[in-house]
Structures are given as C-alpha cells and as structure tokens.
C-alpha cells in the first residue's frame, strides 16, 4: 500500500475512538460517553463523544473528525507555503481528559492524517499526533512509566525516534509567557511521510494504540488518593495553563477555528472549571512547589 489510502486511515480512527471510549468508561466505572454527530457545510463532519461528571473523570472528550475543503487554511500552510491553494482532506482523533482527583494527571492525545490535492500533481500527505501528560501533583514513577511506554512503542521504528519526538513534545507544549512546559511531555510528531505510507501509518497506529497503555495504569494507581480543598484549588489554578496554551498557541485549535470547524468540538479540550489567581507563588518546600521546581522543565525520564 505505497499509495496513501485515506479509507483505511479513517477505519482505524473510528475504531480507535470506540476503543478509547470503552476503556475510559471502564476506568470511570460510572459514567458513559454521549455521542454527538455533526456535519460541516464546507464538507465532512465527525462525532464528538463526551463524558461528564463521572466518578473518576470530571470531563473527557474524544473527538473524531473528517473534514474536506477547497483551499488549505493559513494555519496549515504557515510552514508549508507551497501547499497554499490546494484542496485538502483532514481526519483525526483528538482527546482531552480532565479527571476529578488532582492526583490524576490531565492528558491529551491526538492522531491525524492530512492529504492535499492539486490537479496534475501527486497528492501531498502526512501523519501527525502524539500524547502528553499534565500532572498537578506528580509522582516520578508515573512520569517515568509514561515515558517508558512512549519509548517502547517507538523502538520498532528506530532508536532515534523516541528522543526526537520527546524533544519535539517538550518544545511544542511550552508556554513562553510562563517560561514553563505545559506538563511532563510525551511524544509529538508532525509532517511524517519520509518512510512511505505503510510505515508512517504503522507508527501513527502505534501511538494511538499506546495511549491507554500509558495512561490507564496511572489512573488506576491514583484514583483513590484522598484530597481536600487545597489540592482542588491548585488543580483548578493549574488548569488555567491548559486554557492559555490551547487558545494562544495550539496549531490544532487554530486550524479548527480557521477552517470553520465545529466550535463545540474544537473547544471540547477546555476544562469544565478553572480559576486564575494574581501572582500566585507556591510555598517553598510544598508539594505544589515540587511541580514547579522539578517537572515544568524538560528532563530525561528514561
């Protein structure tokens, strides 16, 4: 299958959405996902699946979208100006999970496929995606296990893959105005096509399939950890960083808004509750300070 085949990619993505939702429902044990299918006037559509007020997850959204358009938006051609004016097809699964318990990290994952067409020319295509972890009260064993899972799924594709995409993740999920990373990273890749369609698709599948393998053990380990108002207030404050990053820097959010995407689905990543506090500084030696001192800068975890 050397020729890019969007049909097999779409089939995988729909199955991935189903499997991830089933896995999250099992972890929660109480709530289930509601499905909301939508169509886009310019072409395409998708299904947003959202779980709210569960026993474990305050809100979890797992979105599938498949959109088409006559011309690529500015967000997609900013670093590929030669693609301006091409028609495009974009599909992917994107998820964000906001747990109730502050000891369970927030997480985000995304896998996507993009193909651009022009009469008389070969299609230009690529895969992208990754997953990342945003703890509030981090445990080093959780972070190391998360990165070990990421490294393990990369190894069949080459020894250089994990370090490369781990570094890209650290650089991408960074808030310059705060001078801190959004969390402890994971994997991030984009413009993946150099190895040909089959191998590139294999890697995208490995990342998508690896997400629950990495996240589920952390949820199981931390979901019964007792917490109080202090931890909840800090969790809500740190969720503000998620909002800041997604609305100011995230390419996917900008792409969705610029292509006339479905606003409810694009902003599904927003936490249901969040707070800001003027000039907050954690108390020295506190668990909150541990996050700032040891986890919000790139580190080698494995």
UniProtKB/Swiss-Prot annotation:
What residue spans carry the region label Important for dimerization? 242-277
* This protein's pathway: Porphyrin-containing compound metabolism; protoporphyrin-IX biosynthesis; protoporphyrinogen-IX from coproporphyrinogen-III (O2 route): step 1/1
Residues involved in a divalent metal cation binding: 98, 108, 147, 177
The UniProt record lists the EC number as 1.3.3.3
- Gene Ontology CC: cytoplasm
For this UniProt record, the keywords arranged alphabetically read as follows:
Cytoplasm, Heme biosynthesis, Metal-binding, Oxidoreductase, Porphyrin biosynthesis
Q: Name one GO biological process term.
A: protoporphyrinogen IX biosynthetic process
Q: Which reaction does it catalyse?
A: coproporphyrinogen III + O2 + 2 H(+) = protoporphyrinogen IX + 2 CO2 + 2 H2O
Which residues participate in substrate binding?
94, 110-112, 260-262
- Site annotation Important for dimerization: residues: 177
Q: Where in the cell is it found?
A: Cytoplasm
> Where is this protein primarily located?
cytoplasm
The residues responsible for catalysis, as annotated, are 108
Could you say which cofactors this protein requires? a divalent metal cation
Supply one GO molecular-function term. protein homodimerization activity
List, alphabetically, the Gene3D superfamilies matched: Coproporphyrinogen III oxidase, aerobic (3.40.1500.10)
Q: How does it assemble?
A: Homodimer.
Show the NCBIfam families listed in the entry.
PRK05330.1
Protein task: Involved in the heme biosynthesis. Catalyzes the aerobic oxidative decarboxylation of propionate groups of rings A and B of coproporphyrinogen-III to yield the vinyl groups in protoporphyrinogen-IX.
Protein family membership: Belongs to the aerobic coproporphyrinogen-III oxidase family.
Q: Tell me the protein's name.
A: Oxygen-dependent coproporphyrinogen-III oxidase
> To which species is this protein native?
Shewanella sp. (strain MR-4)
Q: What is the lineage of its organism?
A: Bacteria, Pseudomonadati, Pseudomonadota, Gammaproteobacteria, Alteromonadales
């Amino acid at each position: 299958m050397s020729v890019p085949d969007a049909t097999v990619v779409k089939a995988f993505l729909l199955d991935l959405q189903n499997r991830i939702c089933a896995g999250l429902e099992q972890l929660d044990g109480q709530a289930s996902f509601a499905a909301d299918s939508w169509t886009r006037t310019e072409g395409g559509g998708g299904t947003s699946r959202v779980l709210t007020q569960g026993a474990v997850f305050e809100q979890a959204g797992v979105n599938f979208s498949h959109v088409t358009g006559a011309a690529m938006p500015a967000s997609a051609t900013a670093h590929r100006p030669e693609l301006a004016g091409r028609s495009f097809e974009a599909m992917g699964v994107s998820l964000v999970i906001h747990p109730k318990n502050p000891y369970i990290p927030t997480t985000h994952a995304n896998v996507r496929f993009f193909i651009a067409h022009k009469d008389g020319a070969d299609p230009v295509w690529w895969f992208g995606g990754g997953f990342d972890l945003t703890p509030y009260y981090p445990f080093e064993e959780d972070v190391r296990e998360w990165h070990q899972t990421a490294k393990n799924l990369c190894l069949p594709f080459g020894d250089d893959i994990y370090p490369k995409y781990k570094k890209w993740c650290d650089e991408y999920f960074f808030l310059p105005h705060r001078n801190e990373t959004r969390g402890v990273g994971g994997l991030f890749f984009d413009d993946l096509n150099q190895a040909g369609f089959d191998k590139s698709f294999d890697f995208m599948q490995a990342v998508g399939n690896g997400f629950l393998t990495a996240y589920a053990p952390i949820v199981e380990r931390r979901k019964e950890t007792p917490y109080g108002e202090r931890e909840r207030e800090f969790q809500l404050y740190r969720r503000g960083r998620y909002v800041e990053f997604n609305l100011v820097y995230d390419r996917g959010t900008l792409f969705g808004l610029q292509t006339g995407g479905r606003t409810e689905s694009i902003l599904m990543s927003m936490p249901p509750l969040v707070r800001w506090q003027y000039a907050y500084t954690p108390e020295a030696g506190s668990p909150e300070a541990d996050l700032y001192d040891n986890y919000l800068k790139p580190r080698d975890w494995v």
